[in-house]
Each structure stands twice: as C-alpha cells, then as structure tokens.
Amino acid sequence: MNLSKQARERVAKVVKNGAVLIHGNKTVYRNNDANYQFRQFSDFHYLTEWPEPDAHAVILVNDSVPELHMFVLDKNEEMETWDGKRIGQQGAIELYGATKAYSNSQYSDELINLLKGHTEIYCDYSSSVFQEIDQKILNLAVPYDQRGGNFSKANIHSIQPILSELRLIKQSGELELLQKACDISIEGHLAAMKFTKPGDYEYQVAAEMEKTFYHLGAERLGYNSIVAGGDNSCILHYATNREELQDGKLLLIDAAAEYGMYSSDITRTFPINGKYTPEQKAVYLEVLKAQNTGIEMVTTKSTMQEVHKTTIASISESLVDLGLVPQGVEETISMMHYFEFFMHGTGHWLGLDVHDAGSNELDNEPRKFAPGMVTTIEPGIYVRPSKPIIKFPLIDRDPEKLKVRRKEMGMEAATKLEQKEMQEAKTIEHEIPKSLLGIGVRIEDNILCTDSESVNLTEALPRNIEEIENICS
C-alpha cells in the first residue's frame, strides 16, 4: 500500500503538526437488502487504499511525520458468510500500514483520546460523519478556552484544499494505474468499433465493449457508458443506450474503464456502417483539428483557460466554414454563437475521479499546467436535429467581460441582468444546412503534462479517418 503511504507523507509535510480526520463511504442500498457495488470515497482511498465500507481514519502528524489510526469493520464469521471476507484490525496494521487499528464502533470514544494535544484539526466538512460525530467530539477533545482572547483552542480546517492540490499532480505509481486504465479502455473501444453494424442496438455495442473492459481486469466502469447512435450523438450525457443503430449514421461512444481506482475517459465518433459520409467527415475533421491544437497546448506554458479559448476560436472558424452560424468568426466568438454547437468545456482533470480533484485556478489566477497533471481534451460539434432554424442574439457575450461584471455586481445581480439583456436583444435567424442536422462529433483523449511536451495516454486508439474506417469495415 505504498501509494497511500506516500500520500500521507505529502499531507504531513503540509500539515506539519495536527490531525486529519477522514471517513470512508458507506454501503448504499439499491432496494431492500440489495446494495450497489461498493466504491470507496476517493479521498479516503488516496490516504489509506482501504477497500471496505464504514471505515474511519485519523492521521496524527507530529513534526511532519504521519501516524495512521484506522477504525474498521470487525472480523465476523457470520457476516463474512453472507458478505465476504473482512480485513479486520490486524489486516489494517499488517497490510495497510496502520500504527493502530480499532473497531469502527470505537471511533467516538477513541477520537477524544487521539486528539489530545492537537489543536490544528483537518476535516472533511462534506462528510455526514463530520456533521454527526466529529463536530461534537471536537468540543470535548479540544476544550473551549474562555480565559484568554481565543474562544477555542482548536483551529478547524478543511482537508479538501490540501488533498485537491496533491491529487492534481500524479505520482509515477498513479500514472502507471492510469495508463493501465487507458490501455484497457482503448481495447474496449476497439472491440466496439469492430462489432458495430447497422441493425445492432446501442446496448449490444455497450455490452461488447464493457465485456472487454472486465475481461482485461477493470474493476468497474469509470462512469456510465454513453453509446449514442444517430441523433443521440447530440445529447452530451446520453445514457439510455436502447435505440437501434441506423445505416449511414454516426455512433458516439464516451466510455472508459476504471483500474486500481483510476479512471480513463475516452470518446470516439465513428460511422455505423464503416464509412463516413462527406458531411460527417467534414465535421469530424474540424473537431479533430481543434483537438490536435488543444493537445499540443498541454504544456507548462499554458493554462486550461488558454486551451479552451484557443479551442473556441478553432471551433468558431469551423462553424463559419460549415455554414452553421450567420456571421464571421469574430462575431461568433464575441456573441457566443458557438455555444449552440459547442456548449461544454474543452477538458477536465482526470484521476481517481473521472472529473478529478483540482482547481483551474491558483491564487485566483489561471493555473499553468505542471508536470504530472492529466487532463482530457475533448472538443465537439453537435448539430441538434431539434433546431433546424436558430435565432442568434446580437449581443456581446464575451466570457471575460461577463466574468468581470459578475465579480463587480455579484453573481445573482449579474445573471439577472444577462437574462434581461438576452430577452431584449435583437436576433438574426439562420437556417442550418439540412445535411448536417443530427451530426454530433466529440473526440476525447487523456493528456499528461510533462517537463517537455504533452503525452497522449490514449494515442493508441486511432483518430485518423482512414484508420477508423479500416477498423470498422
């Protein structure tokens, strides 16, 4: 359990002296006594790698040296007969590096003793255990001091900012697990491409792909698979996966495996019959152009905001060339007309969570990429069939200007003003080329920032049109 040991050591260097309280996930029931597959809370896994529910951890830090105390389910022969083996307290010490381990039923009583002498306490405010137990215990463990100017001896901090910063930079062991998740996901996508044909159903393609994930060692899906044929490719988080695949249409698959708790996140869009139409090819190549530009920018010289801004510019040029917008590139950007066809971000952090921990800003400024960061790059163009004619508002909606105004006026007041301006704005009506309606294309890869250049962890899954057609045919 070397990864969590290293993580605790990194946390201890930040905390220096204090205590960290962190809680694992509970079993979640689907109905009656049938439960969902258990997955550990990512922050708890990061610090302990503990795989069982209903666990707590207290990390005592003295002079930047961490000491792990675990509270876990007891060994219980009867319960293990029903639900499987339990690791128990001895296993927590021998296998997971705990200095001492207790029954989870002892948490409230032992926490008081463990916290004695510690006044810097780091907690997970979002945890129900913090709200139900920790807050009450802290008043007893670190008593109020009304003799001096300070009302309490305890300084309570959120552990989330520390963990988010640490999780943002992947260590070598984490990158190995993430690469394995990517490799498994690639094979699943290839299986789907080879399997797909007109007349199949979306769920059949999903089954073929997910079978490959599990066959190659995935513990679970990174997220619910999106297998979106035809018009469904224009639905960003489509997850019904029940419709029949039509000849001449596209299939957009956004799906990935999770391995060692780390998730990949890949999207490919390919022809159901193995051959792109000229219109599909035109849209696809524009998205690919934008993605290639974005991938090249994942270096220590750029920020996520700069990547997104460049992607918007590329997509906007494409929308003009494809005849999807009524004005030029400058107006398409400044009036946010591109948002009708590209309405999401260009990327997000990737790791233990598919939308992983970490902020795009540092000290209220856009954050530069740093070695060890992993992001997706996933531009798209979605020509929704439900909008053959679009009324575009003729009003400046530059995101940077809106951001400044929101800071000056406050979010609520600025949002109300924006809505009012949109309602009162003049519009220009534009008819969308019929041959493009229902075409949705997204291409998504997983990109590692290094000291020198970006590394595409999912490069082995083809993006080139000829390669894709060869696989699908």
What are these regions (language model features)?
Residues 1-473:
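Active-site neighborhoods and metal-handling regions in enzymes and metal-associated proteins
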